[in-house]
Structures are given as structure tokens and as C-alpha cells.
């Protein structure tokens, strides 16, 4: 038998109390996918739950440690925020602007903050920060979906597809930001990369161009007196050109520190001279909560060989092919230096550059693209120590749930290569046919690999998301 308690207060559960749902002692052997049978849940609300069981001798266990789920937006009317973007990026102008705009807003938190949540979608991809700290450890979010009707489908004869599909959708993410806020003045910032939304593919054409970047953000601040205050994206936000002056999934990323605005993502900046963000058209896609794994740094690799070449550059071998990037940490630079990382890969290898604005130390890695490489050549600095460089493997955070080992070293090596290759091909909620060239989710490759992936990784939610994309992308 089992008993489930659901409450709005974690501490109440520790006392065996439930203000939402108490299943009572329920006789049965169910242990998986037991349906919630309490009252209808509310949007943007936290629910705590716990469970205890009885064994065959009717001996009861202790209550499990409480766990939490947070509900998202149950209807479009729950969104108070607006889609906004940069005033200088005009969707009617087809030429590609590959820069990454940045936005900010200051707000006040009063006494008695209990909990704060952020619901956010930034297209193509976003990096959110509060009071100088990055929100979450995700990359390449939100995942790729059919955001909206693609203009190129109406005009490009090489793509014989109907522009309408059955279910456009756009994913939003939710973050607990309580510990990032303090009483008084706070600041939130959004940096937008182009991702798959505003993309020039290999040669900067606009075949995949849905429009310029835009975002929607709604923060809910809950107080001990029961009040809820909202901080939302609207035209009161300020905008600027970010130091990410070039952001392209296929062609790389360039960061120019001369465009940094000190204190941009912290309270107290005088931004009165900056222009305001503008309203942008919302994608046709329904805003839907992200339910799949996001991309994260999965592994950090130290060099297995490190060599200074005759031309003064540094050739580094990290021991295996990964999808990710090289991270430079604490490198001594001079004003005007341009640090370059050439991730040795098949075309398109992609640019990776950092322009230095002053003398000092620099720590840097890309944000809105990945590279496929084992070796890299690093240049632009006078000296580089092996301790100042690592490679970070980045991919969808699907946990391995099976292992393989046998007496044949060749078979073991093949399995390791396959496992790494599969992880390298899982980005932004889809599985690609190759992570370095096309970077697109061809279903033929995905269907063949899926049984093997599901046997080796906890990837059910990953494929649920992707197959949902496929289902919704059919013509009516």
C-alpha cells in the first residue's frame, strides 16, 4: 500500500499534513506513474509532495524527503509579459545582422520575499543574468521547434513545402531565482543569440530566417504577506549592442570586449541615455513549457598534449573528439590583442575570437555555438600555460543508465566512440545527423539510432519532445 501527500508548504509535509491532497492509505502494488487526483492545480505555483509505503507485512515506512514541482502557464492569459527585441533590428530587412542584442531592467524587491520564479523564452537562444550572475547552467535554450511560419517557404522554390503545420510551438523555461535576489534594488539582463531562429546557414543566406531575436520574460515575486508582484518584459526595458558582435551557429562567435558596459547586469547603472526595447511580433507557436533535458557542460577535458609551434601559436590535443568548445581561463592579455581558437574540424569550423579591451586576465568561452574537434590551435597571446586551457563537452543532459564492458578491447573502444558520437549529436532538444556541418534533426538518422540510445541513456523525455516536434510539423 502507499500514501501520497501534496501541500503548498514543505514544512507541513514533515508533520504529515497536506492542504492540497491526501490519497490516504491506498492498497495496491502501483509504484510508477500514479496519477495525481487532487483538486485542479493553479498556474505558476509550487507544490510539495511526499510518499510512504507499507510492505507485505503491513509495516509502514517513514515519509520520503519532500520533493517539489512547479506549474507553468496554463493559458495564454497567464502571460502578462510582452515579446520585445532590439529597435535597430527590423524584420522587414532581409540582410542578416549576426550580432547579439542585450537588454536590462532594474526593479525593487521589498521586505518579506518568500519565493521568486522566472518564466522565459528567448529566440533564438538566450542567456539570462540577475545581479551579475548567470541564471541556470543551460546552453542553447530554448530547444529547436517549429516556432512560426518560415518566410522562406513562401518564396524559395527549392523547398516544396506548405508553410502551415498543425502545431507551431515555442518552448519556455522556468527558473527558481529566489536566492539571486536581495532586498532593495535588483537588475535583470537578457542576452539573445541567433540560434536556429535567425540563422544564415553556411553562406549567410536567409533560408532559416524566422526574424530577428526577441524574448518574453515574466518573473513572479511571492511575499510572506501573500502578495505577488511581477517583473515583465515590456518597452520599459533598455537595450544595447552586446560584446557578442557576431553570433552564428554555423560560422562561429566573436566577442569584442570594447562593447562591454560595466555594471550592465547589476543595479545602479545610469542607463538614462540608452534607447528602449520595442515590441516584437509573437511567434505563431503556442508557448509551451520545456519538458526535455537542456544542454549543459557534460565533461571537462584537460590537454593530453600541449605544444608551442614555431609561429608562436599553441597546438593542443584533448584526447578525443567532442562537441563543445575550448575555454581559456585567466590568460594574460594586452589591449588590442585578438585571441583566436581554431577548433580543428571539418568545414565549417567556425570562428572563435575574443577582442581584448584592456591589459589584464581574460576567461572566455563561446555562448551560442558549438564546435566539433579533438585538437585546437590557440593564438593571439604572448604566453599560454597548459593550466589555462580546457575543453568543455556540451550536449543535452541525458544521463547514461547502462554500461557496456567485455573482454574484447576493440568492442569496448567501439562502444565508447559510439556513445561519445551520440552525445555530440544531441543539442537543443533534437538529435542531428552530424554535429559539425548540417546540425539538423534528420528523422532517418534519428529513427535508426533511437532504440540504441534509449537502451543506454535516460532519454525518454528527450525523444518525447522531438517526436512531439515531428507530429506537430505535419501539414493540416
Predicted features along the sequence, with ranges:
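Well-ordered alpha-helical scaffold segments within catalytic/enzyme domains
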Residues: 448-459
Amino acid at each position: 500500500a502507499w500514501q501520497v501527500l501534496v501541500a503548498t508548504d514543505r514544512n507541513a509535509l514533515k508533520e504529515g499534513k497536506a492542504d492540497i491532497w491526501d490519497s490516504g492509505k491506498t492498497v495496491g502494488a502501483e509504484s510508477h506513474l500514479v496519477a495525481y487526483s487532487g483538486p485542479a492545480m493553479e498556474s505558476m505555483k509550487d507544490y510539495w509532495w511526499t510518499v510512504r509505503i507499507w510492505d507485505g507485512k503491513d509495516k509502514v515506512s517513514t515519509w520520503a524527503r519532500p520533493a517539489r514541482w512547479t506549474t507553468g502557464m496554463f493559458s495564454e492569459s497567464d502571460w502578462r509579459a510582452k515579446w520585445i527585441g532590439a529597435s535597430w533590428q527590423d524584420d522587414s530587412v532581409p540582410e542578416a545582422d549576426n550580432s547579439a542584442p542585450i537588454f536590462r531592467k532594474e526593479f525593487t524587491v521589498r521586505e518579506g520575499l518568500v519565493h521568486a520564479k522566472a518564466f522565459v523564452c528567448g529566440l533564438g537562444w538566450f542567456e539570462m543574468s540577475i545581479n551579475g550572475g548567470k541564471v541556470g547552467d543551460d546552453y542553447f535554450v530554448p530547444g529547436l521547434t517549429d516556432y512560426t511560419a518560415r518566410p522562406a517557404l513562401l518564396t524559395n522554390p527549392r523547398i516544396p513545402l506548405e508553410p502551415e503545420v498543425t502545431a507551431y510551438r515555442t518552448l519556455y523555461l522556468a527558473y527558481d531565482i529566489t536566492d539571486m535576489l536581495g532586498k532593495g534594488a535588483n537588475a535583470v539582463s537578457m542576452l539573445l543569440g541567433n540560434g536556429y531562429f535567425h540563422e544564415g546557414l553556411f553562406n549567410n543566406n536567409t533560408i532559416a530566417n524566422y526574424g530577428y531575436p526577441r524574448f518574453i520574460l515574466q518573473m513572479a515575486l511571492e511575499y510572506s504577506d501573500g502578495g505577488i508582484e511581477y517583473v515583465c518584459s515590456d518597452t520599459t526595458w533598455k537595450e544595447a549592442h552586446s560584446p557578442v558582435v557576431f553570433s552564428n551557429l554555423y560560422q562561429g562567435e566573436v566577442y569584442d570586449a570594447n562593447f562591454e558596459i560595466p555594471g550592465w547586469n547589476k543595479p545602479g547603472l545610469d542607463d538614462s541615455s540608452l534607447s528602449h526595447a520595442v515590441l516584437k511580433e509573437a511567434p505563431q507557436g503556442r508557448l509551451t513549457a520545456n519538458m526535455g533535458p537542456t544542454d549543459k557542460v557534460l565533461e571537462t577535458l584537460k590537454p593530453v598534449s600541449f605544444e608551442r609551434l614555431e609561429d608562436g601559436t599553441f597546438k593542443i590535443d584533448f584526447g578525443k573528439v567532442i562537441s563543445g568548445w575550448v575555454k581559456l581561463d585567466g590568460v594574460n592579455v594586452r589591449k588590442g590583442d585578438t585571441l583566436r581558437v581554431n577548433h580543428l574540424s571539418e568545414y565549417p569550423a567556425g570562428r572563435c575570437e575574443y577582442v581584448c579591451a584592456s591589459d589584464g586576465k581574460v576567461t572566455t568561452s563561446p555562448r551560442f555555438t558549438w564546435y566539433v574537434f579533438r585538437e585546437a590551435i590557440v593564438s593571439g597571446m604572448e604566453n599560454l600555460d597548459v593550466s589555462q586551457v580546457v575543453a568543455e563537452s556540451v550536449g543535452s543532459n541525458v544521463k547514461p543508465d547502462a554500461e557496456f564492458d567485455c573482454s574484447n578491447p576493440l568492442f569496448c573502444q567501439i562502444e565508447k566512440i559510439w556513445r561519445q558520437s551520440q552525445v555530440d549529436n544531441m543539442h537543443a532538444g533534437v538529435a542531428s545527423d552530424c554535429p559539425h556541418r548540417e546540425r539538423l534533426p534528420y528523422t532517418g538518422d534519428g529513427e535508426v539510432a533511437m532504440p540504441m540510445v534509449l537502451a543506454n541513456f535516460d532519454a525518454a523525455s528527450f525523444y518525447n519532445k522531438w517526436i512531439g516536434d515531428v507530429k506537430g510539423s505535419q501539414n493540416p
